Amino acid sequence: MAPERLRSTILTKDGINWYYEQEGSGPDVVLIPDGLGDCQMFDKPMSIIGSSGFKVTTFDMPGMSRSSSAPPETYQDVTGQKLANYIVTVMDQLGIKTASVWGCSSGASTVLALCSGFPERVRNGMPHEVPTANPENLQNIHDADPATISRDMAAVSRAMSANEEAWDALGPEVHERLRDNYVRWAYGYPRTIPGSAATKTEDLHKVPIDWTVGAAGPTQVFFENVVIATRESIPIKTLPGFHFPYVSHPEAFAKYVVETTRKYL
């Protein structure tokens, strides 16, 4: 029988009213959402991981979806380091001392910031597709109006899912939340996230790191991830899908998280 899912909210000292979910028991695994900020994307793999002997925690990110009640500074001028500090605070309040941490995109930047800045809290890090530079179509996205951002980012995100049927199946409530999240992301993330990536040698060897990129994505988009991981002799492999493997291929994603985490227990 699948473990029960806890869904609740918690207010941390930085003023963020977090929506969070937990499932399972055992060593802690924290799944950090990508820049779109909605943890519903982890719904299917979370149960698989929780049924495999782990306690899984995830949450909507500050200012996003059901964590929208948050001070503006928590979702403006966002960096991996800023998000890492917020996540340590919520880990403290939830009693999570050490965890294996996964994150994609800005979530991956957050994973690297946790590994570098809070190695005592991280068993192992699993970054997926860390943004190190903005593609041309994001250079001036912060100048666009909210309606244009929501329309364009909905199309881009669907394409980057590499499984449009699974993306659509997230459901109308999730996509309604994402429409607002696209705007907060565009105004708060692209100008500051890429430059915050903790990719120096001194950042990358404090805890074990296993890096991934999407097998279905254009190689050039995240090729710098391959360059950095190779330079630092960090294991790097592909996962099925592109930018959201937990949506497009939930079983394969869960298997990767479980098998990778077990290496470090």
Curated annotation (Swiss-Prot):
Catalytic activity, as annotated: zearalenone + H2O = hydrolyzed zearalenone + H(+)
Keywords assigned by UniProt, alphabetized: Detoxification, Hydrolase
Disulfide bonds: none
EC code: 3.1.1.-
Family: Belongs to the AB hydrolase superfamily. Hydrolase RutD family.
Protein name in the entry: Zearalenone hydrolase
Function field: Lactonohydrolase that specifically hydrolyzes zearalenone (ZEN), an oestrogenic mycotoxin produced by numerous Fusarium specie, into a non-toxic alkylresorcinol product.
Keyword Acyltransferase among record annotations: no
Organism name: Cladophialophora bantiana (strain ATCC 10958 / CDC1940 / 8579 / CBS 173.52)
Comment on pH dependence: Optimum pH is 8.0.
InterPro entries reported in the protein's UniProt record: AB_hydrolase (IPR050471), AB_hydrolase_1 (IPR000073), AB_hydrolase_fold (IPR029058)
A Pfam family assignment: Abhydrolase_1
Temperature dependence: Optimum temperature is 35 degrees Celsius.
UniProt GO molecular function: hydrolase activity
Active site (record annotation): 105, 129, 243
SUPFAM superfamilies xref list: alpha/beta-Hydrolases
Gene3D superfamilies given in the database record: alpha/beta hydrolase
Gene label: zhd101
Positions annotated to bind zearalenone: 35, 105-106, 185, 189, 243
Subunit structure and binding partners: Homodimer.
Enzyme class of the recorded protein, top EC level: hydrolase
Source lineage: Eukaryota, Fungi, Dikarya, Ascomycota, Pezizomycotina
